[in-house]
């Protein structure tokens, strides 16, 4: 996959099993966002060869690929600035015909106090949590999350991780890109590294082992 005639990544195969969370780890500029955008099905031009399917359904042939939702790393730039957080959530719930319990979701993420504020008045961290709530509110079985913990303090990171963990417990599949290796190691069942333009699956490890493997892979073992 890549841009135009330029190939950026060769991914081989990537499988998300029901009720599992996988982490995507690589330095900036290595193609993580390109990969996640391609996997989302929203950018078919990113895929130069091969195929992409959710529950056996090819995204090029069926609207049922809406079973997958992608949360970008835009930091809230893709939210409508004049609409409130609750208006965003209501729109998502209606668009996906979701039965998600919005009140319970917002309480669990701690965003209830500012639901009525227009998103332009929210901090980066608040916007990030609203976006995560929107992704979960779709009730899609596949969540692709690009840096969902960016801009969050430790307490908010915990509530966000707990929310993602709850989705996994419900049988949903989550793919998470993050540089926060401690959180990622605690949250996920497996990891994928991007090494020299190739996606490589890693065995589940502790956060210390993950950090060391990251250093060995990208920093020459420093």
At which residue positions do the language-model features occur?
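Conserved ABC ATPase "signature" region
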Residues: 90, 99-115
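Catalytic Walker B motif of ABC-type/P-loop ATPase nucleotide-binding domains
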Residues: 143-147
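The feature captures the beta-strand-to-loop junction immediately N-terminal to the Walker
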Residues: 25-27
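H-loop/switch region of ABC-family ATPase nucleotide-binding domains
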Residues: 177-179
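Conserved ABC transporter NBD signature motif
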Residues: 41, 45-65
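Hydrophobic anchor residue at the start of the ABC signature
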Residues: 132
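Q-loop/switch helix immediately C-terminal to the Walker
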Residues: 71, 81-95
């Amino acid at each position: 996959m890549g841009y135009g005639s330029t190939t950026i990544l060769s991914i081989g195969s990537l499988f998300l099993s029901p009720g599992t969370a996988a982490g995507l780890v690589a330095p900036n500029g290595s193609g993580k966002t390109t990969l996640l955008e391609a996997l989302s099905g929203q950018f078919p031009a990113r895929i130069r060869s091969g195929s992409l399917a959710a529950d056996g359904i090819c995204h090029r042939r069926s609207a049922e690929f809406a079973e997958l939702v992608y949360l970008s790393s835009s930091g809230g730039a893709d939210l409508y600035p004049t609409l409130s957080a609750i208006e965003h959530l209501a729109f998502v719930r209606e668009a996906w015909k979701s039965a998600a319990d919005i009140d319970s979701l917002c309480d669990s993420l701690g965003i209830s106090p500012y639901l009525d504020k227009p998103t332009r008045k929210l901090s980066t961290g608040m916007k990030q949590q609203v976006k995560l709530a929107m992704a979960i509110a779709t009730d899609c079985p596949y969540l692709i999350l690009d840096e969902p913990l960016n801009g969050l303090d430790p307490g908010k990171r915990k509530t966000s991780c707990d929310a993602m963990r709850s989705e996994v417990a419900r049988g949903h599949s989550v793919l998470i890109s993050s540089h926060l290796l401690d959180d990622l190691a605690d949250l996920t069942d497996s990891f994928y590294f991007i090494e020299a333009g190739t996606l490589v699956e890693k065995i589940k490890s502790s956060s210390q082992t993950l950090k060391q493997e990251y250093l060995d892979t990208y920093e020459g073992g420093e």
